[in-house]
Amino acid sequence: STGAGDDTISVTQGTLLAVTGVQSSIITGGTGADTITSVHINAASGLTASFNFAAGDSIVTGYDKITGYDLATASLFSDKLDFSGTAAVGTLATQNDFGTITSSNVATAGIATFDDAAGFATALIVNSTNLADVVGYLNANTAVEDTMAFLFDSTGNGVADSTMVYHNETGATDTIVLLSGQTGVNTLITANAHTAADAFIL
């Protein structure tokens, strides 16, 4: 755990054991735009890495970047993103405009794409230029504790290279976290399981 500021955190572990009821590592960056690198192999059950976020820790103007976030496989658990409150998988049941974002689509649980057309047709590339509008749109169309993920172009070259995870907080500022280099998230889940490409949120 660290305090305020833009911290760099590196954690290297081996293959984690199937021990229940505990976490192998709990990483809390605190406020600021933290850069977190984690190297490990999760267990089939029990031990995983947990990345913890309080409201205000990782926001649109300064968000955390995680390299080495492991998704679930057919035999291994996913790492955990532990937000304040109890995370739920969002659905985007409404489509209230915000900035340039006027429509959205959710093809699998918790995974969203966005368009600047009134009727969703083509998914926009989300990058630093339109990120604030996407976060505003998610805030306008999700409930408190709802969590969504979407592909993100972190370099501005027009190609999505990472995944951003959004959590609707009770206060005015919502949480977003970048899973750097991770583009294969299939669904968000609230109970860890052996399902390929799922990301565990809590």
Regions found by a protein language model. Give the residues of each.
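Acidic, glycine-rich calcium-binding repeat modules characteristic of RTX/beta-roll
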Residues: 1-108
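Low-complexity acidic/polar repeat-biased segments
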Residues: 77-79, 107-202
